[in-house]
Amino acid sequence: MAENCRTVQQKGKIMKNVLFEKHNHIGIITFNRPESLNALSSGFVQEIHDTVKAAEADDEVYVLVLTGTGKSFIAGADIEEMYPMGPEEIFEFSSYATELNMRLEKMPKPVIAAINGYALGGGLEVALACDIRYASETAKMGLPEVKLGVICGSGGTQRLCRIVGDSIAKEMIFTGRAIDAQEAMRIGLVNKVLPQEELMPAVLELAEEICRYGQLAIRASKKCINFAQDHDIEEGSLYERQRFSELFVTEDQKIGMGGFLRKEKDIKFKNR
């Protein structure tokens, strides 16, 4: 189905905790610390960030998929590493994680989270930064930081409320309770819930569908939706019209609209 799953090599260093493979134009990043339920250590965060950055720069990757090995997507932060840190150290650690999540959110390419198991704390924060979330029936999601005497540190309080609303976000965060996949879908936290064995096939099918369309239009759409988060509707509508108009100088606009007028059934975009 895909190129052989491999560890990622950056600057001569093998990163064993991150696996990367390409399936046509889909990049698949697999978190691979199953012995710790893929807990986020500082080194692991850096490995993920480097791999995401490389996938973003790869012109052959149109859509990025994130998933985990074993029982966990990401089960949270590595508490053993985090426990002895002081304020300056933990601020630096959380800054690394925040940079990763900001990159996922702002990168032009769509990012899909295939939540295969536990997505807790920092793991849910990673998933929240993705554009689309599919979950297995066995997945558990939550932000349990209050149970440890702390709060989210890489965007959880900011993104969860935007996705599920303030009241539900506050209940989840104030109680630290984990919810199951069906509840996550009910509140709009995930798009779809599937049996474990159907999760990746469904995610790849979705990614393949996105890959079929003009990527300039896909990326312009993501920019406009992201812009709406921080601007009023007048500013957002102007920004949308600007991106819409810019696409009328592209080959893809001529190919897409021309193909529609000619009633072509299989339009091949060139992404330029």
Regions found by a protein language model. Give the residues of each.
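Amphipathic alpha-helical segments at domain termini/boundaries
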Residues: K11-N32, R177-E209, R219-A228, G256-R272
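Glycine- (often His-adjacent) and acidic-residue-rich active-site loop
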Residues: Q46, D50, E60, G68-R103, ...
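Conserved CoA-thioester-binding segment of acyl-CoA-metabolizing enzymes
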Residues: V8-T69, M102
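Charged catalytic carboxylate motif
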Residues: G43-E47, Y96, R103, A202, ...
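Terminal peptide-recognition signature
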Residues: I29, R33, E47-I48, L66, ...
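Crotonase-fold acyl-CoA enzyme core
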Residues: R103-L216, V249-T250, I255-G258
